[in-house]
């Protein structure tokens, strides 16, 4: 390929070629070096693919013609596109993306609107997988099962395109990213880390790592890996119950000893000791399941060992699932107990419910089993 001579520049089939969007900067530099080109050509490729959004090798004008021919033969740049878009009454936007495999993933743009009607913050909720293997009993995505891991480029493209949507609808770029869409991010660990590296690169979207939150059901080993890899992103743990018995009933991942509450606590202790970063706990309230005052006190005991905050969510109903949202009165009592126990707590109000874009509702209805 690259700067070396080639016997032929016949374009191979898509199956034969390497998708450059499976790689970040380091991977692109390795790729060109393995094909005989200087490593700086990988930096140039990165700028074209992730900085300018160019997938046509002929347009990459600072690459030698011979290298462009080699890339056409050996590589491809697989983009994903929005095939459907909806806007909710609260101005939340949900987009459906088609992947190269033909499967689809959903992404949500969530505006925080101020008193003047302007968006002071624009958050993209990205998917890291199609479907999810975790099987949480209350989640629409979990009912799908696992279908496909997204590449770093497919994760990046969600933000790239939603950034364009943000400019179109709100006149400003995306400010925050949360890995809280379809899938368990830490089960697609390498691709998620590569995508974060791309998104925060100054030659790409140049987003702040401190504006990115990675959410997990609590995969203990991978939480330790996050600590070791020294990401400056935020960590959110989908807790949803303060005791092993209840959590195992609604979140099957908790049944295994290595991902149970004690194992999770030990991993979070490791994470905090290594990073010193505050931990966020996500806690969705289900009527009669985890919303009692005793549950609130137990939640305080589970979370206050280190600087943390608790985000309370009201359940977003999913057709066919036997969960109900707690009452506003019970929510108020729950909050009151947490505050009395010294817990920092925020009530997160759902956005985009009328277009099934709220937490736990992402599941493309057209997806075959």
UniProtKB/Swiss-Prot annotation:
Keyword Magnesium: no
GO BP annotations, alphabetical order: rRNA base methylation; tRNA methylation
Keyword DNA-binding among record annotations: no
Protein family membership: Belongs to the radical SAM superfamily. RlmN family.
Cross-referenced InterPro entries: Aldolase_TIM, Methyltransferase_A, RlmN_N, RNA_MTrfase_RlmN, rRNA_lsu_MTrfase_RlmN/Cfr, rSAM
Positions contributing to [4Fe-4S] cluster binding: 132, 136, 139
Function text: Specifically methylates position 2 of adenine 2503 in 23S rRNA and position 2 of adenine 37 in tRNAs.
Compartment annotation: Cytoplasm
Name this polypeptide is given: Probable dual-specificity RNA methyltransferase RlmN
CDD domains referenced in this protein's UniProt entry, alphabetically: Radical_SAM (cd01335)
Amino acids binding S-adenosyl-L-methionine: 183-184, 215, 238-240, 316
Additional remark text: Reaction proceeds by a ping-pong mechanism involving intermediate methylation of a conserved cysteine residue.
Cofactor binding annotation: Binds 1 [4Fe-4S] cluster. The cluster is coordinated with 3 cysteines and an exchangeable S-adenosyl-L-methionine.
Any one GO MF annotation of this record: 4 iron, 4 sulfur cluster binding
Native species: Salinibacter ruber (strain DSM 13855 / M31)
């Amino acid at each position: 390929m690259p700067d070396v001579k080639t016997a032929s520049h016949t374009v191979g089939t898509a199956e034969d070629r390497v998708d450059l969007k499976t790689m970040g900067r380091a991977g692109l530099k390795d790729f060109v070096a393995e094909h005989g080109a200087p490593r700086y050509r990988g930096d140039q490729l990165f700028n074209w693919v992730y900085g300018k959004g160019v997938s046509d090798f002929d347009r990459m004008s600072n690459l030698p013609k011979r290298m462009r021919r080699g890339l056409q033969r050996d590589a491809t740049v697989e983009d994903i596109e929005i095939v459907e878009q909806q806007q909710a009454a609260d101005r939340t936007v949900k987009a459906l993306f088609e992947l190269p495999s033909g499967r689809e993933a959903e992404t949500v743009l969530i505006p925080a609107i101020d008193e003047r009607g302007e968006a002071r913050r624009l958050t993209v909720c990205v998917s890291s997988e199609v479907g999810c293997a975790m099987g949480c009993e209350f989640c629409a995505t979990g009912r799908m099962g696992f279908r496909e891991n997204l590449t770093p480029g497919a994760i990046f493209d969600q933000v790239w395109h939603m950034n364009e949507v943000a400019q179109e609808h709100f006149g400003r770029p995306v400010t925050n990213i949360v890995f809280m869409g379809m899938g368990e991010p830490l089960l697609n660990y390498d691709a998620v880390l590569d995508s974060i590296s791309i998104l925060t690169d100054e030659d790409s979207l140049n987003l702040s790592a401190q504006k990115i939150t990675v959410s997990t059901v609590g995969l203990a080993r991978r939480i330790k890996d996050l600590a070791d890899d020294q990401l400056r992103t935020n960590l959110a743990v989908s807790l949803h119950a303060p005791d092993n018995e209840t959590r195992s009933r609604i979140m099957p991942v908790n049944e295994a000893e290595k991902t149970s509450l004690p194992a999770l606590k030990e991993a979070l202790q490791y994470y905090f000791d290594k990073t010193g970063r505050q931990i966020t706990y996500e806690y969705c309230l289900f009527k009669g399941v985890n919303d009692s005052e005793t549950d609130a006190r137990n939640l305080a005991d589970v979370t206050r060992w280190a600087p943390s905050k608790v985000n309370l969510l009201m359940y977003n109903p999913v057709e066919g699932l036997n969960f109900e949202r707690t009452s506003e009165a019970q929510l108020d009592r729950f909050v009151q107990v947490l505050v009395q126990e010294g817990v920092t707590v925020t009530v997160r109000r759902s956005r985009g419910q009328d277009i099934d874009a709220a937490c736990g509702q992402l599941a493309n209805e057209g997806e075959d089993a």
